Amino acid sequence: MSAVTLTTYTEDDVTSWLGAKEVEKGRAYTGQVHELEVDDQRILALVSGSARQPYTSSARLVHHKNGRISLISGCTCPVGVDCKHVAAMLLKAIDER
């Protein structure tokens, strides 16, 4: 079985990292994702939301020695991490593969 990477993760992975509620909210924002950048180390995007300026969202994966994979995310929205903007960015990256 291959290790999950930023170019191979699935929507099920996103749900396990962020929860079904954030994924549902994020799905409505996938059309608001701009300047999406994906590489081996991180995903970065601007996501339009309720603020005048778009939020900057980012994510990277951490592969633990025990085999567990966790997502480290950040966003300039008031929530700050693991939010609907991060979910939208991750879902949009899947859509654009």
Please place each PLM-identified region on the residue numbering.
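Long, low-complexity, compositionally biased intrinsically disordered regions
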Residues: 1-97
